[in-house]
Amino acid sequence: MTLVIDDLDDTTIERAGALIAREHAAARQLRPELPAGFDDAQACAAALQRLRDSDHRGLVAAEEGRAVAVITVAVREVGGIGRYASLRAEGFAVEPSLADPTGVLAAAFGDLASPLIAEGVLRYYLVHIALSRVEEALSNLGFGRHGAYGVQPAVARRSSSAVAVRIAGAEDLNTVARLALVEMQHRSAAPMFAPLQDPPLADLAARHRGLRDNGAVHLLATLEGRDVGLLTIELTSPAPRLCPDGQPYIGPTATLPDARGRGVGHTLVDAAITWAHAHDYQWISVDFETANPLSRPFWLNAGFCPVGYGVLRLLDRGAAGQFG
């Protein structure tokens, strides 16, 4: 069959939305924690339109008039990294009946990325739903796993730890900033090797004041009279197709190095989930770097089920064909 690739526009958006809904329904059979709203084709088309309205462009690949892949992209810039291409989960899907979608994705990604590469955009970060055949196809195309998104029900928990947890007030924002900096600097350690970040504490405090003003809740853990841990509860999903929007999402979280292994993190998570349950929320979600030797086992052991992944492809055109 001939693969036809068209722009995502008013003539293709409904077919693309129907494809995302088909893939999402198939994924929810394996991972019921995924948001149910993306089972609906109209909701998926509306999400695609929101991407279009925020400077994303996209392509729809079809065989015999039926969409088999949709992929969208927007170029963004972040300090310490520069320009990169963002490919969001609500703008990416593959026909679930395809046994091996590598060829379809290769054609669509090639057409989408070629003009960006010509402009010097060499870093591509794609977020996708957790389906093994999609993971394998993206690996075949040179993408490597970078992050994971996990969800679990908000069911009240009891904690018997000696760690005390309180909700931070405005007077605690300097403590929040100090603990948030611990997390940021940990990411530059092996084996993550992220660029070192050392923003002024005043800037971090202002950032977290903004989160608090927008409804975020900061939980502080105290051990032996000392504030040693932070967990931030936000209500804005970083990936609405994976983490339910309007439901608690765990943001910046940290434990001081000398307090690790003493139940601080688990007590904070128990408190966050209990807070979510007490406020009549159904779900709580988190994202974490899979290379982080502290985060990955911690969040999995805390009961979060991976529902999607962020994968990265960094093009080094000078090294092509030089390995092996």
Regions found by a protein language model. Name each.
Residues 2-19, 24-30, 164-187:
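A short beta-loop-alpha structural element at the N-terminal edge
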Residues 23-24, 28-107, 223, 228-251:
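Conserved donor-binding loop and adjoining core beta-sheet/short helix segment
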Residues 88-162, 308-316:
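Acyl-donor-binding surface of acyltransferase catalytic domains
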Residues 92-97, 256, 260, 289:
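Residue-level recognition of the GNAT/N-acetyltransferase active site
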Residues 99-114, 252-255, 261-274, 278, ...:
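Conserved acetyl-CoA-binding loop-helix of GNAT-fold acetyltransferases
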Residues 124-127, 250, 284-288:
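Conserved hydrophobic beta-strand within the GNAT/NAT acetyltransferase core sheet
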Residues 129-145, 266, 278-279, 290-308, ...:
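Conserved active-site alpha-helix within GNAT-family acetyltransferase domains
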Residues 163-246:
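Flexible, substrate/cofactor-facing loop regions flanked by secondary structure
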